[in-house]
A protein has these predicted regions:
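Short amphipathic helix-loop junctions that connect adjacent transmembrane helices
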Residues: 6-21, 200-216
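Interfacial helix-cap and linker-helix signal at transmembrane-aqueous boundaries
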Residues: 12-13, 44-45, 131-136, 206-207, ...
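Helix-to-loop junctions at the C-terminal end of transmembrane segments
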Residues: 36-49, 133, 231-244, 325-326
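Conserved MFS/SLC helix-loop-helix module at the cytosolic interface between two early adjacent transmembrane helices
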Residues: 36-75
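Helix-loop junctions at membrane interfaces in 12-TM secondary transporters
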Residues: 69-80, 263-273
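Intracellular juxtamembrane helix-capping segments at the cytosolic ends
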Residues: 89-105, 283-297
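Symmetry-related core transmembrane helices of the 12-TM Major Facilitator Superfamily/SLC fold
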Residues: 140-159, 332-350
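C-terminal transmembrane helical hairpin of 12-TM major facilitator-type secondary transporters
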Residues: 242-289
Length: 373
């Protein structure tokens, strides 16, 4: 769904004849909607079965998919994107919460594979959008067909979601996250800040700092995305072999070393290889941290807090790199990401090591049930 929308952003900008700055403000409205809905969804998950919340948010998001492309003004687009982002944020929290429930019912890690499915879906949607654009199909028609098709597919899939969780404790109100949740959320912030910054600025680094051609610069994001997809599809197997703490810390260390080498060498081909390694290293950090947050009671709010902090890093990372690079240069600014990933390497073991104990604290009972419709 997200891939379908993102692929049509350039068309929408041309269609509305808006500047990059105006488009950026509209996209910030989408992010604002997500940041509002994520904590609220966490508390809804504390009271309703996760499968029910996934079903409701997924179906609502599918119905909203064509709406941004139907906007006739920047103001209309901003309002639509706020609601669109809220639905997307709610669905993301619900899906990850349900993924944690399925993972615990199976007794083995699956979160990396689930996030790998997201990566594959994004590639597929972007490829389909390119084909339909080449065929001359109006993006509004494509998004309408896609929205209806994804609604029917989601309706079928969400009837077969399996295990779900609800939290049986009473009286939870909106409250500040606990110290373990803050630690995990802080690591999510650093990891997703690095992920967003590398994704958006790796190509620009190749173009302006290594002298790569436009086609060569595009290989930076392609290699980074390829590395992430491969690592996520194999991440659960590695997790079972070496454990989540070693996988998180080793992956963060790999990204720090690879990105540091990219910045020191400053040549196109080695940099592309380095960005592939960055994708391999960073891919499983978010699934591991979300799994850890989902084991801390109260589970829905804990996961939502980690997700919100991480998403904030993903949002602020790319523009922050842009602002700082104007003053210090892009290579020096990207070097700050190396420092952030070293921090993840140092603190990752402490964050994941405490979640098993904290998931048993608080006297609240987690009910895992089969959801059938």
């Amino acid at each position: 769904m997200i891939g379908t929308w993102v692929a049509h952003i350039p068309w929408l900008q041309d269609h509305l004849r808006i500047s990059k700055a105006t488009l950026g403000l509209c996209l910030l409205c989408m992010a604002a909607g997500a940041l509002v809905s994520m904590p609220l969804t966490g508390h809804i998950l504390d009271r309703l079965p996760s499968a029910s919340v996934v079903r409701a948010t997924a179906l609502a998001f599918c119905l909203m998919l064509p709406l941004p492309l139907l906007a006739t003004s920047p103001y209309m687009l901003a309002a639509i994107l706020f609601v669109f982002g809220a639905a997307n944020g709610a669905m993301d929290v619900a899906m990850n919460a349900h993924g944690v429930a399925i993972q615990e019912s199976l007794g083995r890690p699956i979160m990396s594979s689930l996030h790998g499915g997201w990566s594959i879906g994004g590639f597929a949607a972007a490829g389909l959008a390119a084909l339909t654009a080449a065929a001359g199909l109006d993006p509004r028609v494509e998004s309408l067909i896609g929205g209806v098709g994804l609604f029917l597919l989601s309706l079928w899939i969400t009837r077969r979601l399996g295990a779900s969780f609800t939290h049986s404790s009473e009286g939870h109100v909106l409250s500040l996250p606990t110290r373990p949740v803050v630690l995990i959320g802080g690591l999510c912030f650093l990891v997703m800040l690095a992920e967003g910054a590398i994704g958006d600025w790796s190509g620009i680094y190749l173009r302006h700092n290594t002298g790569a051609s436009p086609a060569g610069a595009a290989l930076a994001f392609t290699g980074f995305s390829l590395g992430m997809a491969i690592a996520r599809l194999g991440g659960d197997l590695v997790n079972e072999r070496i454990g989540p703490s070693r996988l998180l810390r080793g992956g963060a260390a790999l990204v720090a070393i690879a990105l540091g080498a990219v910045l020191l060498i400053g040549q196109t081909l080695p940099s592309v290889v380095g960005f592939v390694l960055c994708g391999l290293g960073i891919a499983n950090a978010v699934p591991l941290l979300f799994s850890a947050a989902g084991r801390i009671n109260p589970r829905g709010p804990s996961l939502a807090a980690a997700f919100t902090l991480g998403y904030t890093g993903f949002i602020v990372g790319p523009p922050l790199i842009g602002v700082l690079s104007d003053q210090a240069g892009l290579p020096r600014t990207l070097a700050l990401l190396v420092v952030a990933l070293v921090a993840v390497t140092v603190l990752g073991g402490r964050a994941l090591g405490r979640t098993d104990q904290d998931s048993r604290v608080g006297g609240a009972e987690v009910v895992v049930a089969e959801t059938r419709s």
